[in-house]
Amino acid sequence: MQSKNMIVASSHQQQQQQQPQQPQPQLKCPRCDSSNTKFCYYNNYSLSQPRHFCKACKRYWTRGGTLRNVPVGGSYRKNKRVKRPSTATTTTASTVSTTNSSSPNNPHQISHFSSMNHHPLFYGLSDHMSSCNNNLPMIPSRFSDSSKTCSSSGLESEFLSSGFSSLSALGLGLPHQMSHDHTINGSFINNSTTNKPFLLSGLFGSSMSSSSTLLQHPHKPMNNGGDMLGQSHLQTLASLQDLHVGGNNEDMKYKEGKLDQISGNINGFMSSSSSLDPSNYNNMWNNASVVNGAWLDPTNNNVGSSLTSLI
């Protein structure tokens, strides 16, 4: 009996094995309700959370888990690069270029003296000097226009007289009548035009070194009973000499050397004088005054070689 039961059980098992296994019912996609799904794997290798895939919407879901609104391919997770407008970069570059172009090449460079729009009263001159375009006598002829109609002699006399009157206003004890009474003879100014810049520059160079000595004795007798024209009177005019701009460096160096030599000679002549006797100043200015259109008399032995170098 037992053998018969064992044979029946074995035959029953073989029949079950021969019968095809019925496939498990496919789950519907929770997103698109499609039955075209398949089992993929167990989430985290756990039998409690199997993971399925929907072939219709091509997205995954986990049984027993929450659904995430994830698009196909997960493109929303990629960082989108925002393109900046190119106008901002162009505006910054243009502002930098404009600032560089507006700045001068040399900020310390002094512009031409004639182009400076200073009022003539700034230098103590009258209003009619502006019509001459600020052509001062200290500027050589190559810096000024020779076609101007204003006379240089009138400018020089106006320039010198206004400089002397401004000194009297400073309270230095200088008389106001020196501007027209006993300043400089007219023939002294109306000399040859080629020697005017050199003559005035020589006077300005000598006034800088001996101004302190002459300021202590502002009243010195001169020819014809007038006051002596001290070198300190031209000190204000010498300050304007620093405003000049030369066109040739070699010419300026040559003129500076000549000015230093002239000022040194005059200082030596002044220091060699024995005393401040008024007669010595009378002799000096009588010899240096203009006689018949001549600036100096080189045959006179009373005047040292320092004054003959001014010719």
UniProtKB/Swiss-Prot annotation:
InterPro entries: Dof, Znf_Dof. This is Dof zinc finger protein DOF1.4. Transcription factor that binds specifically to a 5'-AA[AG]G-3' consensus core sequence. Keywords: DNA-binding, Metal-binding, Nucleus, Transcription, Transcription regulation, Zinc, Zinc-finger. GO terms for molecular function: DNA binding; DNA-binding transcription factor activity; zinc ion binding. Residues 1-12 have a biased composition (Polar residues). It is found in: Nucleus.
